[in-house]
Structures are given as structure tokens and as C-alpha cells.
Amino acid sequence: MCGTPRQAVDADETVVADLVTTACSGDRRAAARLLTLVERGGEPADAVAEATHPLAAGAQVVGITGAPGSGKSTLTDGLAASLAGAGRRPAVLAVDPSSPLTGGAILGDRVRMEAAATAGAFIRSMATRGHAGGLALAVPGMIRVLDACGFDPVLVETVGVGQVEVDVASAADTVVVVV
């Protein structure tokens, strides 16, 4: 599934290397902490990228996009639950609009994905943090972390999109447009 990251050089890299090893052994909290580091950016995110890049095995990435209210979350929930029920290890990155007050995700699609959560899929909601294009800037790095941790496929649900929100096409192997 995944190997051992290269030897750490300083304290921050040691923490990241330990998190990567723990996450790769199946610890979901460690995986969530790595995703948080990537989402926050900066040097810790760079250390995560460096540690996980050689471990990524090429998980299938499926982008799920469409207009607001078209059923993206329902489709994502059902697909993740079905994949988990078939013995796969799906992960979901649900990208939501950002709250103008907190900067966090407004809708929290993760809360509505009951079937997938019950079946054992890994689900992470995140905010766009004002980035246009339907995704957050951290999504490619987060996909790499999930891939390195052995999740396959990785489902990326975008915010409700218009004609200019096409970032998912560059991040996914397959794009599903829900109409």
C-alpha cells in the first residue's frame, strides 16, 4: 500500500514523517492532520508534499461537478458507499463555498453523506477560501496525501459551478457532470 517516507531532517519534518507513517498504516486521524497541514499551506504543507510524493501510487481521481442543487452530494454519497461496500477504500473531498464570516465551509456536505460515512469512506469537507474555479488551491496536494495513504478512488466534489469553474478537469482522471 505505501512505503516509508525518507528520513526526516528537522523537527517539523520528523512530525510530518511520523504522521505519514501513521496515516499510511490506516490511522484516519493522522490522515486528517496531514490534510489540515496541506490546507493551511506554507512550510508544513511543503514537507507533507515532499514526504507523500514518492508514496503516491496513482489512485483514480473522479471529479464530480455540476450546478448547485443538481445532486452532486447525493451521487457522491451513493458512489462512495457503493465502493466502500465492495471492499474499496474511497475518499471524498467535498469542496464547499467559504463562509464570509469564518472562512470555513458553508454547507458541510460531509454531514449529509451518511451512507458513505456508515460504509467506511473517508470524507473531508473543505472551503474554497475564496478561490474561483470550483476547487480550493490545496486540492491537488490533498489528493496526493489520500493516494499515499492508500485511498482509491479519490472523489472530488466541487462547489456548484458555472461556465468558468473548470479546475476539476486538471485535478481528476475522470469528470462526472451532474445535470
What are these regions (language model features)?
Residues V15-G26, A31-V62, A67-S70, L75-V178:
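Nucleotide-state-sensitive switch-loop elements of NTP-binding domains
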